[in-house]
Amino acid sequence: MKIFSGSLILIGVILAIGGCQKMKRPPLGEYPQDYTTTPTTPLRFYVPFDSSKPEHSQINKRFRDSISDYPSFFPASNVKVIQGVRATAEFGGSVVYNNANDWGQSTSFTVAFWEKNTVPVGEPQWLFTLPSKDGWTNSNFTAYVEHQAAGSTSTDAVIKLIWGVDADQWLEFVGPNKMPGNLLNNQWHHLAFVYDQTTSKITYYVDGAALTGLPSNLTDITKNGGPMGPAQFKTPTGFVIGGWSKHGGFGGAQDSWIQPWKGGMDQFRLYNKALSATEVAALYNSKL
């Protein structure tokens, strides 16, 4: 009977140890998380690309969102770390995230970042995307830079923004309205896109200064023939820096001409407010 009892105890210990081993989880931050963080300031998502902490030595952790501290997915092997505007930056492709925290619920917003690139040749390159689970584009808001044959030069860039899951509104910097500022001269430049729900207008900033004199089809955001009011992103999912929805595996068009950003990205910020001109200038002047 003692032998039988001892055997039962031994089996119980082995099962307990085995159960503990099976339930062991990887350390926090080992993989991208699949739930959202609710930030406490208007800055809802922020990727500085420059952590030098030993625990962030893996590239996906260096490229983490510093608000939630969650890493990105591992980027493609061609994505590298380069010298940025403050410390290090990302170069060469897309960086994908499970989400942008709760930024997709914003009613006013600001997208701000630093970029460095030459003129795309042959195909457009994507700047960023807030993907969606719906619509033929599978994206709520995205922006890209056209290639040389489409009119981009080192001094004036053809930039296009698409708002809405069914490409409801196109905001196209083309012809006489190409975006100035030497954005494609292979130097770092700061861009900010600011939407204010009280005016239903979007303001564009290049190197801390607002672009003025733009036609209404570049500034006025509409819905059903009237002002948009609060921004309305539909079923947002994930976020892609330097790519469209396809680069993050979120569906949408899969054509080969849809290319990731092949230059540099740094200090990528998403706010749930319309930053003022003074606040945008401060980001530029402080290299934030």
Regions found by a protein language model. Give the residues of each.
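Short surface loop/edge beta-strand patches of beta-sandwich-type extracellular domains
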Residues: 29-38, 90-109, 175-181
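Extracellular, beta-strand-rich glycan-interacting domains
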Residues: 45-52, 109-119, 239, 243, ...
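C-terminal motif of bacterial Sec signal peptides marking the signal peptidase cleavage site
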Residues: 15-19
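Short, aromatic/His-centered strand-loop micro-motif at the edge of beta-sheets
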Residues: 161-190
